[in-house]
């Protein structure tokens, strides 16, 4: 029996109706993302001027340590490598602290990002 679910919106209701059809693909995609997040976290730990905070999200929050500041690292990555990251200094709770936010993307993009950081580290 089809029963309308009144406590969620129509988009969520539609998703619930088709979830079983795509459940295996969804679970596979989630696992692929988790695997890439774990791999990327290990790669980021190669960077001496970053302290990577644990996450369950689709991004990392990292403390930037000398010789860089969050603002300087953000500027260098954009100017030299066309990579834009979030300097979290504008966040009220992180004001005055050197934190950045890094999106987790695909393996190729993530490796390019790490290579850029390694280049900055080795200069």
Go through the PLM ranges and name each one.
Residues 33-34, 47-81, 104:
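Conserved PLP-binding catalytic core of the aspartate aminotransferase-like
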Residues 88:
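Beta-hairpin "wing" of winged helix-turn-helix
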Residues 79-80, 91-123:
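PLP-dependent enzyme catalytic core of the Aspartate aminotransferase-like
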Residues 1-46, 50-53:
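PLP-dependent aminotransferase class I/II
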Residues 5, 51-52, 75, 91-94:
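Short secondary-structure boundary/capping segments
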Residues 14-15, 32, 39, 72, ...:
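Alpha-helical elements of Rossmann-like donor-binding domains used by nucleotide-donor carbohydrate transfer enzymes
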